[in-house]
UniProtKB/Swiss-Prot annotation:
PROSITE patterns (alphabetical): ISPF
EC number: 4.6.1.12
GO biological process, one term: isopentenyl diphosphate biosynthetic process, methylerythritol 4-phosphate pathway
Protein name: 2-C-methyl-D-erythritol 2,4-cyclodiphosphate synthase
Lineage: Bacteria, Pseudomonadati, Pseudomonadota, Gammaproteobacteria, Enterobacterales
Amino acid sequence: MRIGHGFDVHKFGGEGPLVIGGVRIPYEKGLLAHSDGDVALHAATDALLGAAALGDIGKLFPDTDPAFKGADSRVLLREAWKRIRAKGYRLGNLDITIIAQAPKMAPHIPQMRVFLAEDLQCHMDDVNVKATTTEQLGFTGRGEGIACEAVALLIKE
């Protein structure tokens, strides 16, 4: 068994839609990023890559490469997962914590879990997503951006 941890943060201000966990969330602000800025999938991808000792999302999909400008993070997650599977790992579980004062994530979490299970070819019981605030403390509490942490357990087949 191998454990990986992922973390990502993006600042509000992007032109694009707000996408978290692969879900378009109605909100007046997007996130600034080279790709679609999906903090949940970026943290999840980093956790999975870390557990497999495959580096991180920036190594595989550098923000200096124009090919990844505006990239769909679900596509990046699936590509990372393909590489992890090629090393002989399967998912034990993935746990994601989204940290945001707004917008509220709870209505969107079920669909996030569906997308994660599809992309990782696993059961919904193997993926968990939850959200919290920082009680108006720090940059997320001031509504300046969104952060996310993820932990993944991989099992060698």
